[in-house]
């Protein structure tokens, strides 16, 4: 799917979708959904659910602060692309949410590794490690990184004091057994 955030113009975006005659689904608290050319698009009111727990509230506020500085975001055809720090924090939270509810796929681990490798030269490691620590995602991000390094055969730029090798093995087994179902 494609995730969009319209910088506070959530309702305006929904109205534009309706005006274009596209079926708009408002079944979700965090975002609306619509489909264009077979691709699901999520128009986010929030980046993550800030009301679910303290982690959600922290991550939502951290992401808002990261998106406020437009200078850190590249643009493509006039659209802002998330900064390395934004993308990393959002991905860690999003993946942890899905892992806890329905597992994640091997593709998600590969996406994590490819993303970190792509941002190798521009990610502010101290900022992202601080955010991960503050919202309780350090261990999960370390596990994702450990698995991604094993699968992709690369050393990623995000280094943790603890790699949780045994837990990473169990998580990978969960993922692989889930994919077999």
What would you call each of these model-derived segments?
Residues 6-181:
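Conserved NTP-donor binding/palm subdomain of two-metal-ion nucleotidyltransferases/polymerases, i.e.
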